[in-house]
């Protein structure tokens, strides 16, 4: 299962969807495409807004500052991930710990 832990200044994505075999997993592809598209968009607007830390099976998005335009991209990413989680509840879980 992919877990997306949402905090005020950090989003952590861990795990595997396990919907299908490696290379054929549409849930993993959807989550990856959503997150990477958002990261690229945010970096184009202001490359100091976020830092990315990637390890095996884990991606941390650290939010260094809040800017309206990039906050909207982050909100859109989370909305898309919520939609994926709603469609595939056995494969994606959103854990909201925003304060």
What would you call each of these model-derived segments?
Residues 1-26, 35-36, 40-99:
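N-terminal intrinsically disordered, cationic/polar leader segments
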Residues 31-33:
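Gly/Ser/Thr-rich active-site loops/lids in small-molecule metabolic enzymes
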